[in-house]
Every structure is written in structure tokens, then in C-alpha cells.
């Protein structure tokens, strides 16, 4: 498990560190190489950074509540992966989605 030692201001989820590799293994088997993934409730943004690094052909669309995008944007900037798209503001409790 790698912690962002060079970027101490990025949020880190220990659960994400534990599960990102097994999730990537399953996604690699199940998704087309150029799949589009909408992640609902992206949290820290770690999954998006990890998945776009390990599955370089995919487009990963993170989403999160307004006010919780800073960490996702930080991970996006750090990862510099083309497939890591800018996060959408999404509240699944609302009737209207972007």
C-alpha cells in the first residue's frame, strides 16, 4: 500500500488502499478496454487515480457532493491521467442529475 508521501495534503482512505487492487483486477476482466465509468460517491478520489493508472484506456468520471471535490481534484492533478475526468457535483438524493 502506498501513501501519498510527496503530497501530504491529499486525503487518504485506508479502505481504498486495501481494496483498489482487487477492484481493478475485477474491472480489468469485466470492462471493455475503452469503457466509461461513472463513480458515484468518489470520496477521496483515490480510486479514480488508481484505476486510470492501471486501466489506461478507460474514462473514469468521479462524482461527489458539492463541497467535497477538493480531494478528488488533488488526486486528479497528482495522477495526471487523461482518463481521470473532472469530478461532477452529484447528489443522488436529488431528482435532477447532471
Briefly describe each language-model feature range.
Residues 32-34, 56-57:
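Short glycine/proline-enriched coil/turn segments at helix->beta-strand junctions
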Residues 11, 39, 60:
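Conserved short-loop catalytic and cofactor-binding motifs
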Residues 98:
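A short acidic, Gly/Pro-enriched loop at the edge of an enzyme's catalytic core
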Residues 26-27, 47-49:
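Short secondary-structure capping/turn segments at boundaries of alpha-helices and beta-strands
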Residues 34-43:
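Conserved class I S-adenosyl-L-methionine
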Amino acid at each position: 500500500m502506498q501513501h501519498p508521501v510527496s503530497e501530504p495534503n491529499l486525503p487518504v482512505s485506508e479502505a481504498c488502499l486495501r481494496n483498489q487492487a482487487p477492484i481493478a483486477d475485477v474491472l480489468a476482466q469485466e470492462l471493455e478496454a475503452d469503457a466509461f465509468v461513472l463513480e458515484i460517491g468518489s470520496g477521496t478520489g483515490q480510486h479514480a487515480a488508481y484505476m486510470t493508472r492501471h486501466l489506461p484506456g478507460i474514462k473514469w468520471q468521479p462524482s461527489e457532493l458539492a463541497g467535497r471535490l477538493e480531494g478528488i481534484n488533488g488526486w486528479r492533478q497528482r495522477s495526471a491521467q487523461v482518463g481521470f475526468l473532472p469530478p461532477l457535483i452529484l447528489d443522488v438524493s436529488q431528482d435532477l442529475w447532471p
